[in-house]
Amino acid sequence: MITKQQVLEFLKNYDLENITIATICSHSSLQIFDGARKEGFRTLGICVGKPPKFYEAFPKAKPDEYLVVDSYADIMNKAEELRQKNTIIIPHGSVVAYLGTENFADMAVPTFGNRAVLEWESDRDKEREWLLGAGIHMPGKVDDPHDINGPVMVKYDGAKGGKGFFVAKTYEEFEELIDRTQKYTIQEFITGTRYYLHYFYSPIRNEGYTLSKGSLELLSMDRRVESNADEIFRLGSPRELVGAGIRPTYVVTGNMPLVARESLLPLIFSLGERVVEESLGLFGGMIGSFCLETVFTDTLEIKVFEISARIVAGTNLYISGSPYADLMEENLSTGRRIAREIKIAAQTGQLDKIIS
């Protein structure tokens, strides 16, 4: 991984009054470019081949310029060119997925957030250690598939967007569906309502919901629309579907807005606070936007089954603000909040606290 000291050396040559915000043209890039422009930054979209035509349909979110590469791996060879433009990369889910964790960790361009979180987020065992260490309630883990005696969710390491997940109720079903060439985790299947909670942690803001260092914000929340799980049961009962050779899949195709009962907000903030505080001790803290992927049970317990330590696509619902963000500032998206953090850090000489 590129060192923090190397990144700080790059920053010494930056014109901090002319920073460029860049990301790969995918995932939440429209929101990121829109938010950066609203905060006065120049924007750069990175794409393979011809720039996507759909950006022409959204002029407020179209990047000011494109960096066209032959492959995503070729981005590594463009580091000097990006640094000459005073670029700060905003990582989203596709950036890490397309570049790969090793390339992303080694990319010689200042990046928003703490890249050290990758080690803890991408390994499900370390992720579980982190969350349990924070006192978070998680679904039970099944170490031996022979011990499956009820519904479980099986996840392959690195599975994103709902791909690489399946549900099994018995060892026999598990054996029928498992790909043993991949590392996997078996979790208890929790019944309830899924909520994806979108937070923002600032190490440089010391007002609002303050922590031991910095402050925590709740910007929004969503629920994912999954194919074919959300519609499949129109065809019959689970037993009838299995008998017909049809099994649910969980590929994310979109997102739906949600709000939570106000009485649950103290617990929601407590979850975010504990996760951030634990991260400060483990790897110096995650920075910026993150998402706790949860299930709310009928006893109003919240169980966390995963964390995404960067902007998630569910925040795209709220480019013009959310019911929660509006109570802090109107028209505040997660993309704009990221740009605002960079802007304040640059103006106050604190970029070293939010980039890696």
Curated annotation (Swiss-Prot):
Residues that bind 5-amino-1-(5-phospho-beta-D-ribosyl)imidazole-4-carboxamide: 27, 94, 255
Cofactor needs: Mg(2+); Mn(2+)
EC number: 6.3.4.23
Keyword presence, Metal-binding: yes
Recorded metabolic or biological pathway in which this protein acts: Purine metabolism; IMP biosynthesis via de novo pathway; 5-formamido-1-(5-phospho-D-ribosyl)imidazole-4-carboxamide from 5-amino-1-(5-phospho-D-ribosyl)imidazole-4-carboxamide (formate route): step 1/1
Sites where the protein binds Mg(2+): 293, 306
Domain ATP-grasp: 101-333
Key word Cytoplasm present: no
Residues engaged in binding ATP: 145-196, 226
Catalytic activity: 5-amino-1-(5-phospho-beta-D-ribosyl)imidazole-4-carboxamide + formate + ATP = 5-formamido-1-(5-phospho-D-ribosyl)imidazole-4-carboxamide + ADP + phosphate
One annotated GO molecular function: magnesium ion binding
Alphabetical list of InterPro entries matching this protein: ATP-grasp, ATP_grasp_subdomain_1, IMP_biosynth_PurP, IMP_biosynth_PurP_C, IMP_biosynth_PurP_N, PreATP-grasp_dom_sf
NCBIfam families to which the protein is assigned, alphabetical: PRK13278.1-6
Function: Catalyzes the ATP- and formate-dependent formylation of 5-aminoimidazole-4-carboxamide-1-beta-d-ribofuranosyl 5'-monophosphate (AICAR) to 5-formaminoimidazole-4-carboxamide-1-beta-d-ribofuranosyl 5'-monophosphate (FAICAR) in the absence of folates.
Similarity remark: Belongs to the phosphohexose mutase family.
Name of the protein in question: 5-formaminoimidazole-4-carboxamide-1-(beta)-D-ribofuranosyl 5'-monophosphate synthetase
Source organism (scientific name): Methanosarcina barkeri (strain Fusaro / DSM 804)
